[in-house]
């Protein structure tokens, strides 16, 4: 998605060679027009998949996932990273380690929001090593739901996430695929 790539080049900041800071438009301050266009792109790409729910992990995936869910006219389910007093014992949980923070957390899904009849579009802001997506897929498998596709805003293609997810048999559709980045440049994989 050229619009997202252009915004990354304009407002993204590379830290080292592995971290891309997108605080100005995705995960601290959110550009609602960009999120609407991202939601439209995901909705169009996955239009023939019979999606019944969009799922994301809190918190940076919420804005684009909500826009996609709205365009598809389906509910959004948010996987929780923190225990909540409103979520009781009837839960699916799995441990996930964040690439960015290098901390582990218990990814949690209430059993009453996803069923075996659901056809899921999983959306997340980044894909690096694929750990978050793999954890979300584990939870959705526990619920016996079908993962119809995975939508990623920014993929670090020089890391193994896509390969890991593809090896599990899932389609990954990324809007901006970075093949190389350092503090001076960001190079994208150009899609046809």
UniProtKB/Swiss-Prot annotation:
E.C. no: 2.4.2.22
Name of the protein in question: Xanthine phosphoribosyltransferase
Record-linked InterPro entries: PRibTrfase_dom, PRTase-like, Pur/Pyrimidine_PRTase, Xanthine_PRibTrfase
UniProt-listed HAMAP family: XPRTase
Assigned GO CC terms: cytoplasm
Pathway assignment: Purine metabolism; XMP biosynthesis via salvage pathway; XMP from xanthine: step 1/1
NCBIfam families documented for this protein: PRK09219.1 (NF006671), XPRTase (TIGR01744)
This protein's encoding gene: xpt
UniProt enzyme class: transferase
Similarity remark: Belongs to the purine/pyrimidine phosphoribosyltransferase family. Xpt subfamily.
Organism encoding this protein: Agathobacter rectalis (strain ATCC 33656 / DSM 3377 / JCM 17463 / KCTC 5835 / VPI 0990)
Chief location bin: cytoplasm
Binding residues for 5-phospho-alpha-D-ribose 1-diphosphate: 128-132
Top-level taxon of the source organism: Bacteria
Binding site for xanthine: 20, 27, 156
GO molecular function, one term: xanthine phosphoribosyltransferase activity
């Amino acid at each position: 998605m050229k619009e997202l790539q252009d915004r990354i080049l304009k407002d993204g900041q590379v830290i080292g060679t592995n971290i891309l800071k997108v605080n100005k438009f995705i995960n601290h301050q959110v550009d609602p027009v960009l999120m609407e266009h991202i939601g439209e792109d995901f909705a169009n790409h996955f239009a023939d998949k019979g999606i019944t729910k969009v799922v994301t992990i809190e918190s940076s995936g919420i804005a684009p996932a909500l826009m996609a869910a709205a365009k598809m006219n389906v509910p959004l389910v948010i996987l929780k990273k923190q225990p909540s007093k409103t979520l009781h014992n009837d839960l699916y949980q799995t441990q996930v380690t964040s690439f960015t923070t290098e901390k582990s957390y218990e990814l949690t899904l209430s059993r009453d929001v996803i069923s075996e009849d659901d056809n899921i579009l999983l959306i997340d802001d980044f894909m690096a090593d694929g750990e978050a997506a793999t954890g979300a897929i584990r939870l959705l498998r526990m619920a016996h739901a079908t993962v119809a596709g995975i939508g990623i805003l920014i993929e670090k293609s020089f890391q193994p996430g896509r390969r890991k997810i593809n090896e599990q048999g899932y389609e990954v559709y990324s809007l901006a695929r970075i093949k190389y980045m350092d503090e001076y440049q960001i190079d994208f994989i150009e899609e046809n």
